[in-house]
């Protein structure tokens, strides 16, 4: 069941429709990020209601109608009639959007992304909401950041589509005290590796997200891990990550070991080629362990990422952050995919998000 009527939907009704749209478009090859970027716009345009007329002025085909408020409504209605489709219908409107993708209609490339590229994009839901706003909706007032907020909300709270239960990548240690930074001396030269020391020797660090051990190197005292799913990074990007922890000895885990976010992952140590008890940390983009690269000998092969762009430092004491741009995040971990566990905590946010929706105040042309 979906909700189709000429009224503004409640958050619970919007969620039913949003989940339906996610399922429908996922099966047609859209990424979850792209769908939620569009949902963030649909929420402002129509409260995700395929039966909504602009200003509730039913039958006024010179105004907007439907999920994305096609304006004038007659353009969409005439198309639906020509296809033999009922125009007040969720599937009909989604078929129209797919038709627009395939026929290069409605979309004007104002953000260096075609409509076909948009539906496959894995940029953040927030970024894609802004791209959809600029290239598809094109309102008189383009400054509507709440559409990005709404897109992130749907990405977190809808199940399926490849992104349910999205976790924030949390910095693994409860302190930051850097003993050697990026592009440092010896093994750090030309790399984004960072060494951290604890308050004591054998200081603990913890899994930043649900993850799996993918490589064990006893001679160098290192374990490589990959995230089990894409994670929300401190800089707002959504991606798989692979990282290496070095110097604990003996190594505590074997390849294939799975950890949940917050599980004990290791300790600072003096294993391998090391001077003093510390933790050598390095992260790359993606979920494939590609071995070491010689820079000269301590960096993961692949596309290195800045640790401070990936791992949020919520509740982390920064003793010596080396001047890097460490970031906190207000992202709350998803519910594991069923979309229900966070409902009580999000009631206030739901109301605020709904009140922000332009649909409650009319539309911007």
Curated annotation (Swiss-Prot):
Protein residues bound to Zn(2+): 188, 195, 280
Region entry Lysozyme-like glycosidase, spans: 1-159
Cofactor: Zn(2+)
Stored InterPro entries: Dup_hybrid_motif (IPR011055), Phage_lysozyme2 (IPR041219)
Enzyme class: hydrolase
Family stated for the protein in its record: In the N-terminal section; belongs to the glycosyl hydrolase 24 family.
Binding residues annotated for substrate, in chain numbering: 45, 71, 106, 137-140
Active-site residues from the entry: 45 (for lysozyme-like glycosidase activity)
Keywords, in A-Z order: Antimicrobial, Bacteriolytic enzyme, Cell wall biogenesis/degradation, Degradation of host cell envelope components during virus entry, Degradation of host peptidoglycans during virus entry, Glycosidase, Hydrolase, Late protein, Metal-binding, Metalloprotease, Multifunctional enzyme, Protease, Viral genome ejection through host cell envelope, Viral penetration into host cytoplasm, Viral release from host cell, Viral short tail ejection system, Viral tail assembly, Virion, Virus entry into host cell, Zinc
EC number: 3.2.1.-, 3.4.-.-
Cellular compartment(s): Virion
Probable metalloendopeptidase: annotated segments: 166-365
Biological role: May serve as a plug to restrain the highly pressurized packaged genome and thus would be the first virion protein to contact the host cell wall, degrading the peptidoglycan layer and thereby facilitating viral genome entry into the host bacteria. Acts probably as a multifunctional enzyme that degrades N-acetylglucosamine polymers (in vitro) and cleaves the peptide cross-links of the host cell wall. Essential for the tail assembly.
Protein name according to UniProt: Morphogenesis protein 1
Annotated segments matching region Linker: 160-165
Species of provenance: Bacillus phage phi29 (Bacteriophage phi-29)
């Amino acid at each position: 069941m979906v909700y189709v009527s000429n009224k503004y939907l409640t958050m619970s009704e919007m969620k039913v429709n949003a989940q339906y749209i996610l399922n429908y478009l996922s099966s047609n090859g859209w990424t979850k990020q792209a769908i939620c970027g569009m949902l963030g716009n649909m929420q402002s345009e129509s409260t995700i209601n395929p039966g909504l007329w602009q200003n509730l002025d039913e039958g006024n085909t010179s105004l907007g109608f439907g999920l994305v408020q096609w304006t004038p409504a007659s353009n969409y209605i005439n198309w639906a009639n020509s296809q033999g489709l009922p125009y007040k219908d969720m599937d009909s409107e989604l078929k129209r959007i797919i038709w627009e993708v395939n026929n290069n209609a409605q979309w004007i490339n104002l953000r260096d992304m075609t409509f076909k590229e948009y539906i496959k994009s894995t940029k953040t839901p927030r970024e894609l909401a802004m791209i959809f706003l600029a290239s598809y909706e094109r309102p008189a007032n383009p400054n509507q950041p709440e559409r990005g907020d709404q897109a992130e909300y749907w990405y977190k709270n809808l199940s399926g589509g490849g992104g349910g239960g999205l976790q924030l990548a949390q910095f693994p240690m409860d302190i930051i005290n850097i003993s050697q930074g990026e592009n440092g001396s010896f093994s750090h030269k030309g790399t984004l590796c960072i060494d951290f020391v604890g308050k004591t020797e054998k200081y603990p660090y913890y899994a930043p997200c649900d993850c799996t051990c993918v490589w064990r190197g006893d001679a160098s005292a290192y374990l490589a891990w990959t995230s089990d799913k894409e994670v929300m990074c401190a800089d707002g990007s959504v991606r798989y990550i692979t990282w290496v922890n070095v110097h604990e000895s003996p190594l505590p885990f074997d390849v294939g070991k799975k950890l949940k976010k917050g599980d004990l992952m290791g300790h600072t140590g003096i294993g391998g080629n090391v001077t003093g008890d510390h933790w050598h940390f390095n992260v790359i983009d993606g979920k494939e362990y590609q071995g070491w690269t010689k820079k000269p000998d301590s960096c993961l092969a692949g596309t290195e990422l800045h640790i401070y762009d990936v791992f949020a430092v919520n509740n982390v004491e920064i003793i010596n952050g080396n001047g890097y741009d460490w970031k906190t995040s207000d992202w709350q971990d998803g519910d594991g995919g069923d979309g229900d566990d966070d409902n009580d905590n999000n009631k206030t946010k739901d109301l605020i998000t709904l009140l922000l929706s332009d649909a409650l105040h009319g539309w911007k042309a």
